[in-house]
């Protein structure tokens, strides 16, 4: 080991103690006497500022000096300075040996003085240490204060000639104060006066460096003092949320967590002993009074017996928008309205008329302020106040207790099959009595017959006009399909059934025995043979909007947009004749229905529904008041005592005709028009379809007990058709809890449970 490396190691140890040396001993250091070079020349050679004081411990180094000046050199044994490269050292040069100079001062106070090179090297170390002190962020590395008086108020030295004492114990005298004129001229002559700060503690002017002024500017802007500080540094997650393989602490659970506490047991024993000896006494429960007022309210009687009840006065009404100094235009009355106020009685006249002002300061004093205050005082003084008890009712108790949907199964809730083939919107569908076949009509002029289970199209009839309505004959032995389009009504032979049924059907549809109609009927309808498909065609004087079969399959009703007795006519297929209704219809008819078991006939107009008896035309009719804007469809329960009416405002009414002529329930479920409603023949189900492309399925149970009201429970919302046009028709399967829907997207869908 060379002398240089040995001295470097010792200087590294001395570096850690350099700060403590100045704080403990505070011994006065003697300047190192240079033989050939001055201190300023050494500082210039080392590349540091000349104003550095140069006080340092000879022989002590910091980490930067150790790395730069005393690192291992190359094979040639030479080393160059890292900063300027001006000072070079070689192995042949004299090196300061630290064997005897680790302690900077001897007992007699003399110092070890090295050679010229050592002095130059020591001054270089001092200058670099000064740079390290300036760059340090620690408050311990700051230049110590001259004044050693401590943290005391300077008011104590106001009357003295000095402000404290320096390190040697000498008084620090105050500077002579300049006149204001001299100080002003000095500030004008000095261009750096804005960077100077007066330190009253040391009685001197301190000039801020550029770095310090930048720090002040950052603090004024609310930024971090140091430019290198990153306030948005990436967050280091010490503990991640992911499950680790090893636990943070795998110490075993202590035994005290598995055994009962000994000290708690002692406390319990102490409390039990005190209870047994009677040291701890419990409060006896207060006995409730058994006396009460027979005809009075207990709560108010208790309050009146104790003290006079105070009822706070009612609060004043808060001002509204009309009392604003700049209200909206709709609150300001016109001249005509103001004139009408003058004609009113004083009691009916509004107490305040809104007025507009340009600003808040232009508002005058309120004229009726004193009058209203006086009237309120009279009301509070003369009018008695009564406390009214509010009835607290749980809102949940007001809701009807409906059964769970799981208990009401089966009902259609999912799409099972789609029937595709039409090119236009499907306007109407109908199922036969057996449930094996379904017929559909579309705006493309085609009528299709489908097999329900497979979705296979069995037959197609093509017409020139859009199909409005199709209806299958309810008798299974008469497979006839009624089709309405424009002004014509066709009876088509579906060619289903046995040979005997086909013979009966062909006889019914034979047009050779058509009788001559009456004169009153001839102006309305005309029976004609269907040359295209071999059936019968009935031509009406107006377009047909709805048709409905009688339960026996012989009569068929058609609805046209006409008033009085011409809007609804009845056709008899067996005799091939038409008859008008024996009563007048008030309003334009929308749709008609036959009663499922009696001889009643339902006619729905735009506002209400009227019930007629076909066997007794002179009997008074029954009128059902719907309260709807316009009726769109109607369906009757198989029992015949309940009627469902749909409207074009999205509402659906349930009528219990034995109960009242007004709706028992009104359901607002669709946001758009309801196109049709349907009731199942055997299951307690009914449904509605709308232009919003949805179909609602409900549970509607009708009880035989007349004292029990029908139960209506919403079950399912069926979606699946496109939003354009919505769902135009819906029908239930006659035997299964299935629902068919016809959409404007030319698709028929089957929903099953």
Curated annotation (Swiss-Prot):
Keywords of the record, alphabetical order, are: Nucleus, Repeat, Ribosome biogenesis, rRNA processing, WD repeat
Q: Which GO terms describe its biological process?
A: gamete generation; maturation of 5.8S rRNA from tricistronic rRNA transcript (SSU-rRNA, 5.8S rRNA, LSU-rRNA); maturation of LSU-rRNA from tricistronic rRNA transcript (SSU-rRNA, 5.8S rRNA, LSU-rRNA); regulation of cell division
Family annotation (Pfam families): BOP1NT (PF08145), WD40 (PF00400)
Which region ranges are annotated with the description Disordered? 1-155
What subcellular locations does the record give?
Nucleus, Nucleolus; Nucleus, Nucleoplasm
- Regions of biased composition (Basic and acidic residues) lie at 7-18, 30-41, 110-121
Q: What happens when the gene is disrupted?
A: Embryonic lethality when homozygous.
Q: Which GO terms describe its molecular function?
A: ribonucleoprotein complex binding
Question: Which GO CC terms are listed, alphabetically?
Answer: nucleolus; nucleoplasm; preribosome, large subunit precursor
Source domain of life: Eukaryota
- Return the Acidic residues bias intervals: 64-75, 83-109, 122-142
Coarse class of the protein's main subcellular location:
nucleus
The WD repeats are found at 421-462, 464-502, 539-581, 626-665, 669-708, 722-753
Assembly notes: Interacts with PES. Interacts with WDR12.
What does it do? Required for maturation of ribosomal RNAs and formation of the large ribosomal subunit. Plays an essential role in cell growth and survival through its regulation of ribosome biogenesis and mitotic progression.
**Family that this chain belongs to:** Belongs to the WD repeat BOP1/ERB1 family.
Q: What is the official name of this protein in its record?
A: Ribosome biogenesis protein BOP1 homolog
**Species of the source:** Arabidopsis thaliana (Mouse-ear cress)
Q: What is the lineage of its organism?
A: Eukaryota, Viridiplantae, Streptophyta, Embryophyta, Tracheophyta
């Amino acid at each position: 080991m060379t002398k240089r490396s040995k001295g470097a190691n010792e200087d590294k140890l001395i570096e850690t103690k350099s700060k403590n040396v100045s704080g403990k001993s505070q011994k006065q250091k003697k300047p190192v006497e240079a033989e050939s070079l001055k201190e300023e020349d050494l500082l210039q050679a080392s590349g540091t500022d000349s104003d550095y004081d140069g006080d340092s411990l000879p022989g002590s180094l910091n980490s930067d000096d150790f790395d730069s000046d005393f690192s291992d050199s190359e094979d040639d044994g030479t080393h160059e300075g890292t900063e300027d490269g001006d000072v070079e050292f070689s192995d042949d040069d004299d090196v300061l040996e630290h064997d005897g100079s680790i302690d900077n001062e001897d007992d007699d106070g003399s110092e070890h003085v090295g050679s010229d090179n050592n002095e130059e090297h020591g001054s270089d170390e001092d200058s670099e240490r000064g740079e390290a002190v300036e760059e340090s962020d620690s408050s311990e590395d700051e230049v110590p204060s001259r004044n050693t008086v401590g943290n005391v108020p300077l008011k104590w030295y106001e009357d003295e000639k000095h402000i404290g004492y320096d390190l040697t114990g000498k008084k620090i005298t105050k500077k002579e104060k300049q006149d204001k004129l001299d100080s002003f001229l000095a500030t004008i002559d000095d261009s750096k006066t804005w960077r100077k700060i007066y330190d009253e503690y040391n009685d001197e002017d301190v000039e801020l460096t550029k770095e310090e002024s930048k720090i002040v500017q950052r603090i004024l802007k609310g930024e971090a003092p140091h430019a290198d500080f990153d306030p948005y540094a990436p967050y280091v997650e010490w503990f991640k949320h992911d499950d680790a393989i090893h636990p943070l602490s795998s110490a075993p659970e202590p035994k005290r967590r598995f055994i009962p506490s000994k000290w708690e047991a002692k406390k319990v024993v102490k409390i039990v002993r005190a209870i047994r000896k009677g040291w701890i006494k419990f409060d006896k429960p207060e006995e409730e009074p058994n006396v009460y007022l027979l005809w009075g309210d207990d709560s108010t009687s208790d309050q009146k017996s104790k003290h006079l009840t105070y009822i706070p006065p009612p609060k004043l009404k808060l001002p509204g928008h009309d009392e604003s100094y700049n209200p909206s235009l709709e609150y300001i009355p016109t001249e005509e309205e103001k004139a009408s106020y003058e004609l009113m009685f004083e009691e009916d006249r509004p107490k305040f008329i809104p007025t507009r002002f340009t600003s808040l300061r232009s508002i005058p004093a309120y004229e009726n302020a004193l009058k209203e205050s006086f009237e309120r005082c009279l009301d509070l003084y003369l009018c008695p106040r009564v406390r009214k008890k509010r009835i607290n009712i749980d809102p949940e108790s007001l809701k009807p207790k409906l059964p769970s949907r799981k208990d009401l199964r089966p009902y259609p809730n999912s799409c099972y099959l789609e029937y595709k083939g039409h090119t236009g919107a499907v306007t109407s569908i109908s199922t036969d009595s057996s449930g094996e076949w379904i017929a559909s009509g579309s705006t493309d002029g085609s009528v299709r017959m489908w097999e329900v289970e497979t979705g296979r199209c069995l037959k197609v009839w093509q017409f020139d006009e859009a199909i409005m309505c199709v209806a299958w004959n309810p008798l299974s032995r008469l497979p006839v399909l009624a089709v309405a389009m424009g002004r014509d009504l066709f009876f088509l032979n579906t060619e289903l059934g046995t040979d005997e049924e086909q013979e009966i059907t062909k006889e019914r549809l034979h047009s050779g025995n058509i009788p001559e109609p009456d004169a009153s009927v001839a102006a309305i309808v005309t029976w004609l043979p269907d040359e295209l498909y071999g059936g019968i065609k009935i031509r009406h004087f107006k377009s047909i909007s709805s048709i409905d079969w009688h339960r026996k399959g012989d009569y068929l009703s058609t609805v046209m947009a006409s008033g009085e007795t011409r809007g609804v006519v009845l056709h008899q297929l067996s005799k091939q004749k038409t008859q008008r209704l024996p009563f007048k219809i008030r309003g334009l008819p929308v749709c008609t229905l036959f009663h499922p078991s009696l001889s009643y006939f339902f006619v729905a107009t735009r506002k209400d529904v009227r019930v007629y008896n076909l066997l007794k035309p002179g009997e008074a009719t029954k009128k059902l008041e719907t309260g709807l804007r316009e009726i769109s469809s109607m369906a009757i329960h198989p029992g015949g005592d309940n009627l469902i009416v749909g409207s074009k405002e999205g509402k659906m009414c349930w009528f219990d005709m034995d109960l009242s002529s007004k709706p028992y329930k009104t359901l607002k479920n669709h946001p758009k028009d309801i196109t049709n409603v349907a009731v199942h023949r055997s299951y307690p189900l009914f449904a509605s379809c709308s232009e919003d492309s949805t179909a609602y399925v409900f549970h509607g149970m009708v009880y035989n007990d007349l004292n029990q009201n029908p139960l209506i429970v919403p079950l399912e919302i069926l979606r699946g058709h496109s939003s354009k046009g919505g769902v135009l028709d819906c029908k239930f399967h006659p035997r299964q809890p299935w629902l068919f829907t016809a959409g404007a997207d030319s698709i028929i869908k089957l929903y099953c449970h």
